[in-house]
Amino acid sequence: MKVILNFSPNFDPKKRNKSEIKFIVFHYTGMKSEKKAIDKLLDYNSKVSCHYLIKNNGDIIKMVPENYQAWHAGISSWKKFKSLNKNSIGIEITNPGHGFKYKKF
């Protein structure tokens, strides 16, 4: 396993304090292939990103530094927290999901 730096242009440019981070939001990509998922997360026009992407081989791509908000949680809430991008680290695992037949992970 290795960590690869490949930064996405999609994040909130305002820095946040580590104390603001309260959650980890774990998703699967839901894309047909790993390449398509990576391309989308790096595409400025997609307006989506994550802090970390776990590839099929176990390598990790760091896409957004933790002190910035990635755009992964959309309209979201948990208890008193709203817009979870503000308070979370987003981790994606490459998996086609229910739209393209789940793969074991």
Feature annotation, model-predicted:
Residues 2-105:
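Active-site-adjacent loop/helix surface patches within enzyme catalytic domains
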